[in-house]
């Protein structure tokens, strides 16, 4: 499931393009060899409409009806959070490239794998850089964040960096 419509559609289309490019490249190079067998990839897409409930329904459909054995994650922490319990329930590995909320990785999921740093580290070095550019002196930081899990994780990382550097919010 991927967001082809709704509020995440722009990023969903970019994610789909990236997945397609990777699969085309892997398949053009002969596929992946595992245990003496060679496998080529095929991706099945359904539009989750940027809706977590719909994403979870489609993940279940992909596993139960379409028989997928491996899942590539959707765009956003919220949609990944909706799909992860489904992939966990059926023991289907999911590699997600677009969900970085810390809360995704505190649930003990055995089948969820990430390629991104956690969201709380996104702006960590930005505060360090600001302090460095300020001659090593603490800085004042203005913050404005959305109320979703991802944004709040980024916010917590900024607060940690502010505290660590002696800066102020």
Protein language model regions, located:
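Acidic/histidine-rich, surface-exposed loop or edge segments in extracytoplasmic proteins
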Residues: 1-7
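Active-site pocket-shaping loop/turn-to-helix segments
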Residues: 7-16, 117
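Short clusters of hydrophobic/aromatic residues that line enzyme substrate/ligand-binding pockets
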Residues: 8, 32, 104
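N-terminal cofactor/phosphate-binding cores enriched in small/glycine residues
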Residues: 12, 19, 58
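Extracytoplasmic ligand/sensor domains, especially the bilobed periplasmic-binding protein
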Residues: 17, 53, 68-169
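Signal peptide-proximal N-terminal region
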Residues: 17-42, 136, 163-168
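Extracytoplasmic
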Residues: 38-41, 57, 63-66, 89, ...
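Short, well-structured alpha-helical segments in soluble
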Residues: 44-45, 49-69, 131-133
């Amino acid at each position: 499931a991927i967001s082809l419509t709704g509020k995440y559609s722009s990023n969903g289309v970019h994610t789909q393009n990236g997945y397609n490019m990777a699969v085309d490249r892997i398949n053009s190079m002969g596929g992946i060899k595992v245990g003496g067998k060679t496998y080529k990839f095929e991706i099945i897409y359904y539009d989750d409409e940027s809706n977590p409930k719909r994403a979870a329904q489609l993940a279940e459909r992909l596993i139960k009806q379409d028989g997928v054995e491996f899942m590539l994650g959707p765009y956003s922490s919220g949609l990944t959070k909706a799909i992860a319990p489904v992939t966990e329930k059926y023991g289907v590995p999911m590699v997600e490239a677009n969900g970085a909320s810390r809360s995704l990785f505190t649930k003990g999921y055995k089948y969820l794998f990430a390629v991104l740093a956690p969201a709380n580290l996104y702006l960590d070095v930005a505060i360090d850089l600001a302090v460095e550019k300020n001659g090593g002196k603490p800085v004042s930081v203005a913050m404005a964040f959305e109320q979703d899990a991802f944004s709040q994780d980024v916010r917590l990382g900024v607060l940690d960096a502010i505290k660590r550097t002696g800066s102020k919010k």
